[in-house]
């Protein structure tokens, strides 16, 4: 094609993660991934590993304290830390964190696969077909929406969606720190560094950089700056079935418009390839801890 002469032969498309998100229904690749982050489960591993806490939890619930596989176990853990443990090392602690301020990002809180984590939508990856993770039904073989309401074949007001929003509200009020309901996305997620939260079911990995490294205000690392926390797979809700999407992945990508002059497109394409080159991707991962290439994930910077 017209961009062949300005395409890096070392681009190595097979090295990218998230290509399925930038591939159309026709099988063609329409965008080039530049950055990505996921939404996962976050927890204080150091607290979960304390023998006295593990013993107390098992005595009450009859199973081992660990990464919850479902929302029921997550709620048990939230209730346990908020109402039974209450304080650790003299600090008041809570079993859950979230946000509820009326702001645009509260929309992301729901649309970033929260409904499908509960079990709304159809089976299929990266999106459910014919009903996606937003609960919107699509026309067969296209991205044209038909409807979101159950009466139109959608799922945004179905049992799983209603359950998901109810649990978001219940947990926020019952188990999160005071003031969490008045926080937005940008205040809530980095606030875990204050060190008073045991777990969070809906945590964006884009905020990892704010929770690592030596900083007197960062209470979730040890004396050497190593994280006291870990991430795990998203717990699934009661309506979730095998084959449904679980969790969320965001893939920011380069897109070049046909309407742009071809010479300007070529220049943009050269810059895009520079921005996602293996050396630049590695540097971006060192700083922001977001990954877009397999070679970055497997690099010695992150595998020691």
Give, region by region, the residue ranges found by the protein language model.
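Alpha-to-beta junction loops
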Residues: 91-93, 193-203
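Short helix-initiation/N-cap motifs at beta->coil->alpha
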Residues: 69-73, 179-193
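Hinge/lid segment of periplasmic solute-binding proteins
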Residues: 1-42, 228-234
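Glycine-centered hinge/linker elements that transmit conformational signals in sensory
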Residues: 73-78, 119-182, 225, 230, ...
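Extracytoplasmic/periplasmic substrate-recognition and gating elements
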Residues: 23, 173-176, 215-297
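Beta->alpha turn/N-cap motifs
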Residues: 185, 202-207, 234-235, 252
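Extracytoplasmic "Venus flytrap"/periplasmic binding protein-like
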Residues: 1-15, 28, 51-52, 56, ...
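Hydrophobic residues within well-ordered alpha-helices
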Residues: 74, 81, 114-115, 190-195
């Amino acid at each position: 094609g017209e961009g062949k002469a300005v395409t890096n032969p070392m681009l190595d498309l097979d090295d990218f993660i998230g290509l399925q998100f930038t591939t159309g229904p026709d099988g063609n690749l329409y965008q080039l991934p530049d950055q990505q982050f996921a939404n996962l489960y976050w927890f204080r591993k150091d607290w979960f590993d304390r023998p006295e806490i593990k013993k107390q939890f098992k005595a009450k619930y009859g199973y081992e304290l660990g990464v919850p596989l479902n929302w029921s176990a997550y709620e048990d853990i939230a209730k346990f830390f908020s109402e039974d443990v209450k304080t650790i090392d003299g600090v008041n602690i809570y079993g859950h964190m979230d946000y509820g301020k009326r702001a645009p990002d509260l929309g992301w809180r729901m649309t970033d696969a929260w409904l499908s984590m509960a079990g709304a939508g159809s089976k299929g990856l990266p999106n459910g077909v014919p009903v996606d993770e937003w609960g919107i039904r699509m026309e067969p073989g296209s991205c044209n929406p038909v409807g979101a309401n159950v009466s139109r074949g959608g799922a945004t007001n179905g049992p799983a969606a209603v359950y998901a929003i109810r649990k978001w509200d219940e947990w926020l009020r019952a188990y999160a720190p005071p003031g969490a309901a008045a926080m937005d996305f940008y205040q809530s997620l980095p606030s875990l560094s204050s060190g008073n939260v045991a777990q969070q079911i809906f945590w964006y990995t884009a905020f990892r950089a704010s929770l690592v490294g030596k900083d007197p205000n960062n209470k979730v690392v040890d004396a050497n700056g190593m994280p006291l926390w870990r991430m795990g797979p998203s717990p699934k809700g009661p309506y979730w079935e095998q084959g449904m999407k679980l969790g969320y992945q965001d893939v920011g990508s380069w897109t070049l418009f046909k309407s742009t002059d071809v010479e300007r497109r070529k220049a943009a394409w050269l810059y895009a390839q520079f921005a996602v080159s293996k050396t630049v991707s590695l540097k971006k991962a060192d700083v922001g801890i977001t990954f877009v290439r397999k070679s970055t994930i497997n690099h010695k910077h992150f595998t020691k």
